[in-house]
Each structure stands twice: as structure tokens, then as C-alpha cells.
From Swiss-Prot:
Matches recorded under NCBIfam families: murG
Pfam family membership, one: Glyco_transf_28
A Gene Ontology BP annotation from the UniProt entry: lipid glycosylation
Keywords: Cell cycle, Cell division, Cell inner membrane, Cell membrane, Cell shape, Cell wall biogenesis/degradation, Glycosyltransferase, Membrane, Peptidoglycan synthesis, Transferase
Location (main, coarse): membrane
Membrane-protein topology: Peripheral membrane protein
Catalytic activity: di-trans,octa-cis-undecaprenyl diphospho-N-acetyl-alpha-D-muramoyl-L-alanyl-D-glutamyl-meso-2,6-diaminopimeloyl-D-alanyl-D-alanine + UDP-N-acetyl-alpha-D-glucosamine = di-trans,octa-cis-undecaprenyl diphospho-[N-acetyl-alpha-D-glucosaminyl-(1->4)]-N-acetyl-alpha-D-muramoyl-L-alanyl-D-glutamyl-meso-2,6-diaminopimeloyl-D-alanyl-D-alanine + UDP + H(+)
Binding site for UDP-N-acetyl-alpha-D-glucosamine: T15, G16, G17, N123, R164, S190, Q284
Biological role stated in the UniProt entry: Cell wall formation. Catalyzes the transfer of a GlcNAc subunit on undecaprenyl-pyrophosphoryl-MurNAc-pentapeptide (lipid intermediate I) to form undecaprenyl-pyrophosphoryl-MurNAc-(pentapeptide)GlcNAc (lipid intermediate II).
HAMAP family: MurG
The protein, known as: UDP-N-acetylglucosamine--N-acetylmuramyl-(pentapeptide) pyrophosphoryl-undecaprenol N-acetylglucosamine transferase
Length: 357
């Protein structure tokens, strides 16, 4: 690694699944000067600007026959040239990206200038951008080993999905939950999940009557917020650090984004996973299958799940925790979840970047 302060460009944009792992890696590189490449009006504009210089470009994805669409192609070419100018102006030595739309111009621009790129793919099914452009990257870091099946011949390293340092720092959830009661944590991902919210609210009365406490992270765009009122039901639109809630909960209902799964694994929390059915190429189902196969979770496709089924599944899984004299399946699931955790993921990716400087 060069003696001078290394200069890096992080290209991560859109959802928490792209931005949060990149922030975790950035935290693991305190010696570096990091510039950030994003898109206007996306999550990174809220999270990154106070920490790193943020540069934004407008860019779309590789959806459909984009080469046949002159306007899309021109925008992409324009974005590549803008990133090239940024790389030269900031004297960038290496680029890190977490995939998604922003990765296209970032990888292309860096490759054209001979600047090495590390790409992190968090999902078990790599995205289209990753499959197309990973051949131009010096290293490809994987959240799941299974993703390597779709990337033959690439310079791969399985590192898990990085979590921000605050996830591992002791803190209190600050909620008025009694010490020994069973707690169900419902998470819809960084963008929320209206379908899950409605299923949970419809099923909740039976859970509450049985003695379960529910902490429901609804997302900020939930149209039904406030409709369910109960002393044991706590509704939050967003929390910056979910770790204290994960550590307090007995079980979780969650989407199956790679970031959420990494958090569940880190906390050793068993779960029922409802993959987002409209995710690109249904990639959340691929993620969920790995957790289900390991015994860490139950996979429940949204299209097949009724309120009655969800209600009964949760009651059955938590029956021992609710006081029934039966075997408790949760400790075995929790142990399986914990085995999927990679504690030094961010440091591994940081070391990949250091090795290229």
C-alpha cells in the first residue's frame, strides 16, 4: 500500500442493501480519503454527505435492450465520462462498489483508466450489473459462496456482507418491554413492506392475546400506520441501529435482503422470511433458501401466505416461549443462524482494497 493517504472512490447507491455495506467498509478504512459516488435523491444523500464528499450522477440500469435505446445509451456514456473526470480530478487509486445501477459507469470508467475495482455482491444470485461487469474488476467479494456459481472465472473471495461498526457496539433499545416476555420483531427492509405490514396487523390480535410482544418496523411509507393500537404492540417507522432490537427479540418476520439476513445472522436470530416478490430476478428468494436450508429460517413465499397461516406458524414456533410444556425449536434455529455470520466481513473487504494500493 502506498505511504501517502490512499484515495478511494466508493460507488454505492439506492437502497440500504447497497449503501450500508459500503459504509461498513468505509469505516474499516480510517486511513483512506474516500469520495462517494451516488445518485441524486437516493438514500446516500441522507447518509453519506456528512461523512464523505458526495458526487452524484444520473444513471439508469441495464434493463431490457438498452443498447437499442439511444437516449439510455447516451446517458450511460455521459455518466462514464463524468466518472472518468472525477477519478482523474480526485486522483483515485482504487474503486469499491456494491453493484446496482451506479456500478456500471463506475466500473467502466475505472477500467478505462486502469484503476483497480473491488466489487461486492451481497446476494446469492448476482445482479445483472455484477454478471456483466465483474470481469472488469480486480476482485469480486461475495456475500454468499453460492453466488460464485454464476460468476465463473472471476477472482472471487467469500467475505459475507459487511455490517456497520455500530451494530457491534453495546446499546439499549430503550423500549418499554418487560424483561422476560417473548418478543417478535417484524422488519420490512430499508424501504418497508406494505404487504408484510398488513399481514402482520391482521394476524397480530391472536399473538397479542397469547402474550407475545411485537416490535414492528413499518418503514416510512406505511399507509396504515397507527391503525393497530395495543400496549404490547410497538410501531416504529425506522431505527438507525436495529442491533439492540435483534438481540432482544426471540424471533423475526423479515424480508430476505442480504443486509437484513446479515443482521439476523449476526444476532443469531431465527426468522420467518417473506422474500420481496418483485425484487430483480426474485433474488431475495435465492437468499432465503440458503437460510432455510441451513435451518436458520422458514421460507414463506408472499403469494402463498395467508393471514391464518402466518398466525398459526408464529404461534407454533413460539408456543414453548409462550409457556407451553413442549420442545422449543428456536435455540436450534438460532445456532444455525449464528453459523452464517462472518464477523470480520468489513475488514476482509478493506484488506482487499489495501492489497490493490
Amino acid at each position: 500500500m502506498s505511504v501517502a493517504q490512499p484515495r478511494l472512490l466508493f460507488a454505492a447507491s439506492g437502497t440500504g442493501g447497497h449503501v450500508f455495506p459500503a459504509l461498513a467498509v468505509a469505516e474499516a478504512l480510517p486511513e483512506a480519503k474516500i469520495d462517494w459516488l451516488g445518485v441524486p435523491d437516493r438514500l446516500e444523500t441522507q447518509l453519506v454527505g456528512d461523512r464523505y464528499p458526495l458526487h452524484t450522477i444520473r444513471v439508469g440500469g441495464f434493463q431490457g435492450s438498452w443498447l437499442l435505446r439511444p437516449l439510455t445509451a447516451l446517458r450511460l456514456i455521459g455518466a462514464i465520462f463524468k466518472v472518468r473526470r472525477l477519478l482523474k480530478r480526485q486522483q483515485i487509486e482504487a474503486v469499491f462498489t456494491t453493484g446496482g445501477y451506479i456500478a456500471g459507469p463506475a466500473i467502466a470508467a475505472a477500467w478505462s483508466l486502469g484503476i483497480p475495482v473491488v466489487l461486492h455482491e451481497s446476494n446469492a444470485l448476482p445482479g445483472k450489473t455484477t454478471r456483466l461487469l465483474s470481469r472488469f474488476c480486480r476482485r469480486v467479494a461475495l456475500g454468499f459462496a453460492e453466488a460464485g456459481e454464476y460468476l465463473p472465472g472471476r477472482p472471487l473471495q467469500v467475505v459475507g456482507t459487511p455490517l456497520r461498526s455500530q451494530f457491534y457496539q453495546p446499546s439499549q433499545h430503550g423500549l418499554p418491554i418487560p424483561e422476560n416476555v417473548p418478543v417478535l420483531l417484524v422488519m420490512g427492509g430499508s424501504q418497508g413492506a406494505v404487504a408484510i405490514n398488513r399481514l402482520v396487523r391482521a394476524a397480530a390480535p391472536a399473538w397479542l392475546a397469547a402474550g407475545l410482544w411485537i416490535v414492528h418496523l413499518t418503514g416510512q411509507q406505511d399507509p396504515d400506520r397507527g391503525q393497530l393500537q395495543h400496549p404490547q404492540y410497538i410501531e416504529l417507522s425506522f431505527v438507525d441501529n436495529v442491533a439492540p432490537l435483534l438481540n432482544r427479540a426471540d424471533f423475526s418476520i423479515s424480508r430476505a435482503g442480504a443486509g437484513s439476513l446479515a443482521e439476523l445472522a449476526a444476532a443469531g436470530l431465527p426468522s420467518l422470511l417473506i422474500p420481496y416478490p418483485f425484487a430483480a430476478e426474485d433474488h431475495q428468494t435465492f437468499n432465503a433458501r440458503i437460510f432455510a436450508k441451513a435451518g436458520a429460517a422458514i421460507l414463506a413465499p408472499q403469494s402463498e401466505l395467508t393471514v391464518e397461516q402466518l398466525q398459526q406458524q408464529i404461534l407454533d414456533l413460539l408456543r414453548a416461549r409462550l409457556g407451553a410444556a413442549i420442545a422449543n425449536p428456536l435455540p436450534k434455529m438460532a445456532a444455525a443462524a449464528g453459523k452464517l455470520h462472518v464477523a470480520d466481513s468489513a475488514e476482509q473487504v478493506a484488506n482487499l482494497l489495501r492489497s490493490l494500493l
